[in-house]
Every structure is written in structure tokens, then in C-alpha cells.
Amino acid sequence: MQALLFLMALLLPSGAGAEEIIGGVESEPHSRPYMAYVNTFRRKGYVAICGGFLITPQFVMTAAHCRGRRMTVTLGAHNVRKRECTQQKIKVEKYILPPNYNVSSKFNDIVLLKLKKQANLTSAVDVVPLPGPSDFAKPGTMCWAAGWGRTGVKKIISHTLREVELKIVGEKACKIFRHYKDSLQICVGSSTKVASVYMGDSGGPLLCAGVAHGIVSSGRGNAKPPAIFTRISPHVPWINRVIKGK
């Protein structure tokens, strides 16, 4: 139930408290040029907010639960409430789900967004490297997450990109969740620290040594760590096939 509440909160309407990084700091403007601000337009004017990240000039990766019929991606943003000259706003042509995405368990919570046109790579817009198929981010590794979500349960949405350093922990810590599989997911965040991802950060990357190893997927409704990230490495063969159009 906690994971469900967290997921629902991740998809709050724009301006109504879509979640943010907890225990982090504001990022240096455009220091994370791969970050994408994803808007999913749903029925009755509802807009869901997620993070994402650019992996090729024409593909953005995010969480599968962030998908929708009409989506727009903003690249090169720091303050999403301003029209920064670095920003590139591009509509999504289509989304591609992995064949084994499980809605109920959130296993394989990953989706590729094909943009209607290629992004123009600049100092503020660039791609991030992915791991190899056998690269397994291990417990004890220190990584970084970033997003525009809330900074706390009762806090308002952040308009500027924020980041937080998080530690990968053992799978035992994520046994509090009904569904967790270490081969497909990463358990992130020490229970002894007030630092985590939260509502609105969903779909954003987990970077370890400059490589995107995970995608923000779900967590606890009270915002306390740990949180669950989708593990990217098992999906690399599928990702490569999609990018190559196979």
C-alpha cells in the first residue's frame, strides 16, 4: 500500500505538488544535461510530471508508469517555470514498452520515448551513458539521483532541478515492499539518513560513476528510504534493438 500511495503521488497534477528530491541540494544549472522534464497530458486537463533522461538524440528513457497518450519532453531545463534559452521542448512521437512490463508488481518499470525530432546536443542538452548488460550496480555503491519533485511530504514542488547522493543497499532492506526482485531492481537509500527520491522524481536516473544504472520507480508513502529503482542493465539488449529500429 505504501508503494501504491507513493506511485499515485508521483503522478500528481502539475502545480499541485508533484514530488521532489528529499535531503538534497539544488543542482548547478545545466550540470546534468541529460535530464528531461516529462509532461504526460491525460483526461480532463490532468498533467502528470515525471523525470527522464536522454540516451540518444531521439530517445528519452523514463519509468513505464509515466507513459500516456500525449507526452512532451523538455530538455536543457534548470528552472521549469522559466523560458530558459537552453530549453528544447519536443513532443513524443510514441512510447515503447518492454515486452515483460508488469503493471501490478512494477517489475521492468521502464519505457523508451521516441521524440518527434532529434534533440540538438549542446552544453545544456546531452546524452548519458548506459551500463553494459552484465554491469550490476552493487550494495555500498554511492550514486546520484536528480529531479524536480517535492522536498518533503508537506513541501511544495520544486521548480529548479535538485540532486541527492544515495547509497545502494542490500535487497533485505527492500523486503518491506510487497514486490522486489534484486535482478530487476535496485534498493536505494539508507534508513539512517534523511535522503531519498519522492513524488515527481519518478522516471529520473540513478547515476553511479557517471553511468545511468537505475530509474526511479516506487517507494514509501511517508518518503522514508529506501526506494526502488528499475535496474537498467538487464534491458540493454532490448534498448539497443529499439534504438536500431529492430
Swiss-Prot record:
Residues 19-20 form a propeptide. The active site is at H65 (charge relay system), D109 (charge relay system), S202 (charge relay system). Its EC number is 3.4.21.-. One of its GO terms (biological process) is proteolysis. Residues 21-244 form the Peptidase S1 domain. Belongs to the peptidase S1 family. Granzyme subfamily. This is Mast cell protease-like protein. It comes from Mus musculus (Mouse). The lineage of its organism: Eukaryota, Metazoa, Chordata, Craniata, Vertebrata.
